[in-house]
Amino acid sequence: MRLDKWLWHARFFKTRTLAARYVEKSRCRIDGRAVEKPHAAVAPGMVLTFALGPRVKVVRIVALGERRGPAPEARTLYEEIDSP
């Protein structure tokens, strides 16, 4: 699944377009490697690091999701890891 689509499914961004713009302009990391393209592939087990407001989020992808569901369903797509 594309990174921007997963970020939208997991409800970190309100629209997929916002998620894509964020990935292009910000520093996201997948398993410690910098990513600049929103079409970067993600899979369960990968660790995603990105800044969201003043905080740095570090999450492990647990599932990809079939649709953008309600917030409780979105929280099942990832588990938060303490940031370094």
Show where each model-derived region lies.
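C-terminal structural segments of small proteins and small subunits
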Residues: P54-P84
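A basic, amphipathic helix-loop patch mediating RNA/tRNA/ribosome contacts
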Residues: M1-P44
